[in-house]
């Protein structure tokens, strides 16, 4: 009986080790359609490959948080997570847009600027 209990405990400990693999997020910022000044569009921030799942993602306009929607948290085959944050916006020649990500694997928030040409 004792060897069985030890084996079960060892198995549980090895499973708990899955949570210990911390992975930093990859961040991509892009618009749904090619950018045209004055034409409504959608701004997307796709964050992937991160673990653990606790994360904070904000879309920013000139450094200020925008109202945005977030997809449900999903995971890949490798058990890393991904999310999409998106909002409607109308690009112009002046405003700057970016995505700010806060995650336990990052020393400071990661900010990725939207490049309207890509």
From Swiss-Prot:
Gene Ontology BP terms: antigen processing and presentation of exogenous peptide antigen via MHC class II; antigen processing and presentation of peptide antigen via MHC class I; immune response; peptide antigen assembly with MHC class II protein complex; positive regulation of immune response; positive regulation of T cell activation
Keywords, comma-separated and alphabetical: Disulfide bond, Immunity, Immunoglobulin domain, MHC I, Secreted, Signal
Annotated ranges, domain Ig-like C1-type: 25-112
Entries under SUPFAM superfamilies matching the protein: Immunoglobulin
Subcellular location: Secreted
Record flagged with keyword Disulfide bond: yes
Disulfide bonds: 45-99
Cited Pfam families: C1-set
Source domain of life: Eukaryota
Residue stretches in coiled coil: none
One GO CC term, this protein: MHC class I protein complex
Signal peptide stretch: 1-20
Gene Ontology terms for molecular function: MHC class II protein complex binding; peptide antigen binding
Role: Component of the class I major histocompatibility complex (MHC). Involved in the presentation of peptide antigens to the immune system.
Family: Belongs to the beta-2-microglobulin family.
Description of how the protein assembles with itself and partners: Heterodimer of an alpha chain and a beta chain. Beta-2-microglobulin is the beta-chain of major histocompatibility complex class I molecules.
Protein name: Beta-2-microglobulin
Originating species: Sus scrofa
Gene: B2M
């Amino acid at each position: 009986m004792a060897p069985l209990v030890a084996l079960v405990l060892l198995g549980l400990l090895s499973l708990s080790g899955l949570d210990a693999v911390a992975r930093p997020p990859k961040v991509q910022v892009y618009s749904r359609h090619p950018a045209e000044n004055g034409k409504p569009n959608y701004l997307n921030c796709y964050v992937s490959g991160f673990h653990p799942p606790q994360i904070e993602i904000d879309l920013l306009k000139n450094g200020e948080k925008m109202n945005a929607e977030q997809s449900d948290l999903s995971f890949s085959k490798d058990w890393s997570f991904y999310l999409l944050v998106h909002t409607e916006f109308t690009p112009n020649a002046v405003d700057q847009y970016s995505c700010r990500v806060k995650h336990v694997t990052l020393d400071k928030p990661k900010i990725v600027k939207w490049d309207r040409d890509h």
